[in-house]
């Protein structure tokens, strides 16, 4: 019968691959093996398409990672911002930290100074809020950038140390190899460390980021006295 042969063959184009499908599969591979092992070829195999198909949607692996970060940033609810500039900086920095702590691989991708230029408008809103609050406090625009960069280094450093340290989460058991962490120290040379001993391990597992952040913000802003409203003596 005419058409019988065609009925058993491949008819038409294969189903289109959507960006959502690509990003979902990429997140799955990152969860399984880490972002370092994600490749365009592995992603194509996961979806069941040729690698060339993916290049219609992304330029390269770096572009793919930033698309994932943009999508994630778009889904993060922004906090209500306090009126006081100092408190606003703290709230914004906490929001940035907490969102990246839930996705620590993204913090690792963003550990280059040029990352700001690659972020979406949604991701930049908290950065803008920190700069605006610093300027409102009395910083110059240049000082405001230094405030943000200092807080960024502190936040990302804390996230990556915890992400790469087994047993750092409160619900984890500390690794056996850290049990004798400070045993055998010479108390005459290192009296404070020797006195702490294994308590260092439990102390280092405490979440002190919020307290450290507040102290850091206060120290940074102390270098620039707050502006005084016009007509107010002092």
Task: Please name every model-derived segment.
Residues 126-148, 154, 158-177, 201, ...:
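Hydrophobic alpha-helical bundle segments that form small-molecule/ligand-binding pockets
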Residues 21, 25, 29-63, 67:
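Helix-turn-helix
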Residues 70-75:
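Short, basic, alpha-helical segments at the C-terminal edge of helix-turn-helix-like DNA-binding modules
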Residues 201-202, 206-230:
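C-terminal all-alpha effector/ligand-binding and dimerization domain
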Residues 77-125, 141, 148:
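Hydrophobic alpha-helical connector segments
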Residues 179-195:
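Short glycine/proline-rich, acidic loop/turn segments that cap or connect secondary-structure elements
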Residues 1-17, 192-199, 228-234:
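N-terminal intrinsically disordered/low-complexity leader segments
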